[in-house]
From Swiss-Prot:
InterPro entries: Enolpyruvate_Tfrase_dom (IPR001986), Enolpyruvate_Tfrase_sf (IPR036968), MurA_subfamily (IPR050068), RNA3'P_cycl/enolpyr_Trfase_a/b (IPR013792). This is UDP-N-acetylglucosamine 1-carboxyvinyltransferase. Pathway: Cell wall biogenesis; peptidoglycan biosynthesis. Pfam families: EPSP_synthase. It is found in: Cytoplasm. It catalyses: phosphoenolpyruvate + UDP-N-acetyl-alpha-D-glucosamine = UDP-N-acetyl-3-O-(1-carboxyvinyl)-alpha-D-glucosamine + phosphate. It is an enzyme of class 2 (transferase). Its EC number is 2.5.1.7. Belongs to the EPSP synthase family. MurA subfamily. Its main location: cytoplasm. Cell wall formation. Adds enolpyruvyl to UDP-N-acetylglucosamine. One of its GO terms (biological process) is cell division.
């Protein structure tokens, strides 16, 4: 659940450190969070995130299921419209993801191109 925790840490007060002890490449998505304006860096098995008041919209690419979900959550709190590409990753693990978020009040839509 690191991507979702990092999405939250991006806008939380203070500094957060998230550790991944198994799969170091799991932090690849942090570069996409940085595209949204996140103050984050990775160092081996750790990601350090300094919370900021507001993320900004940007096009981002999902590299896997959880990274995609985390990017969608970050995009929901970003200022403006965020496009998350390669959402087929999300579809593999979270059926009806968009519909569930909409039912919770999220301003999100799937755009087919």
């Amino acid at each position: 659940l690191q991507p979702m925790a990092i999405a939250l840490a991006c806008i939380a007060d203070g500094t957060s450190m998230i550790t991944e002890n198994v799969f170091e490449a799991r932090f690849r998505f942090v570069e996409e969070m940085i595209r949204l304006g996140a103050d984050a860096r990775t160092d081996g098995h750790h990601a350090v995130v300094r919370g900021i008041p507001q993320l900004s919209s940007a096009p981002v690419w999902a590299s896997d299921i959880r990274a995609g979900a985390g990017l969608v959550l970050a995009g929901l709190v970003a200022d403006g419209e965020t496009e998350v590409h390669d959402v087929y990753h999300i579809d593999r693990g979270y059926p009806m993801f968009v519909e569930n978020l909409v039912s919770l009040g999220a301003g999100i839509e799937r755009v087919h191109s």
